[in-house]
Amino acid sequence: MSWQEKINAALDARRAADALRRRYPVAQGAGRWLVADDRQYLNFSCNDYLGLSHHPDIIRAWKQGAEQFGVGSGGSGHVSGYSVAHQALEEELAEWLGYSRALLFISGFAANQAVITAMTAKEDRIVADRLSHASLLEAASLSPAQLRRFTHNDVAHLARLLASPCPGQQLVVTEGVFSMDGDSAPLAEIQQVTQQHNGWLMVDDAHGTGVIGEQGRGSCWLQKVNPELLVVTFGKGFGVSGAAVLCSDAVADYLLQFARHLIYSTSMPPAQAQALRASLAVIRSDEGDARREKLAALITRFRAGVQDLPFTLADSCSAIQPLIVGDNSRALQLAEKLRQQGCWVTAIRPPTVPAGTARLRLTLTAAHEMQDIDRLLEVLHGNG
């Protein structure tokens, strides 16, 4: 089979399963509204959970940062790309989340890959929730360590896997809020079992940070756990992009030596770090509290109105509200019908989610209004 034949076969298989991914160019894709092809849609597909992507203070901070530092960092943080703006953001994040150190990364994917590949060796074992994000599972699969997956949120299964002999160290990997189901991990129980077997815990809280907990401190703070490795991202609750790893002084120094994604990547622009500092200030403020309260009310309104639809509603109290349809074609058809009626919704299909669980992944944001939720419910009931 030639290269072209290999490529064609893979694409044909995706088309046959109604699983071919496509991108849609949009004029505006974050916040309450999505604009595409000169039409405005209510946006139920973005992860801008607090509606901060268009916040004037954050935009102003980015502009001022660009004027001060330029539009790029100029290199890796190990060369010339680590600015006082990066340093200030790291210090503020560490203080906010109760860690000694924070290290910035250009994306959550890069942060997860960097940590897992740097921390584990051949004699070690990674025990990951089966529904962990692709960045976590891919890194674990590519690492020299042994990978074992436990049934989603099943602490008893996790304990059995940890109890089997391992010549090296064990790293337990999970998420705070799961990206496709919107449910939360039982972090306190997971941490307890991990500690009983002398392992370390790594939590990716991409979808919880900024959105839940006191001052938006996220899933771990809310559940009173302190994992050895906490990954937070800035493309969701923060409304920007990028990520950080929270850890001890020793682990931070170790990652600075061995995390190749950190060492060999151009660091985020200092102007972006300034924007993230402004976003963090909003998240920690009374305004941040108000946005979280509004989002919670919108979620309650949606869940109350969707109960009698002929879909499976995931057990989620987060901004991620999946309606599980099952069939790929049906999910695509529903998404298209909703778009025709002014609601931009995305169909998520395998391999992103398990086979037979194609869904409409609905996401709510504090930028929405109650009438937006009512309109979504009206359209869903008309197409259920």
From Swiss-Prot:
Catalytic activity: 6-carboxyhexanoyl-[ACP] + L-alanine + H(+) = (8S)-8-amino-7-oxononanoate + holo-[ACP] + CO2
Binding-site list for pyridoxal 5'-phosphate: G108, F109, S179, H207, T233
Parts of the chain that traverse the membrane: none
Record's protein name: 8-amino-7-oxononanoate synthase
EC number: 2.3.1.47
Record's keyword terms, sorted: Biotin biosynthesis, Pyridoxal phosphate, Transferase
A Pfam family the protein falls into: Aminotran_1_2
Molecular function via GO: 8-amino-7-oxononanoate synthase activity; pyridoxal phosphate binding
Modified residues annotated as N6-(pyridoxal phosphate)lysine in this record: K236
GO BP terms: biotin biosynthetic process
Function according to Swiss-Prot or TrEMBL: Catalyzes the decarboxylative condensation of pimeloyl-[acyl-carrier protein] and L-alanine to produce 8-amino-7-oxononanoate (AON), [acyl-carrier protein], and carbon dioxide.
Originating gene: bioF
Similarity comment: Belongs to the class-II pyridoxal-phosphate-dependent aminotransferase family. BioF subfamily.
Class of enzymatic activity (EC top level): transferase
Cofactor: pyridoxal 5'-phosphate
Subunit: Homodimer.
Pathway it works in: Cofactor biosynthesis; biotin biosynthesis
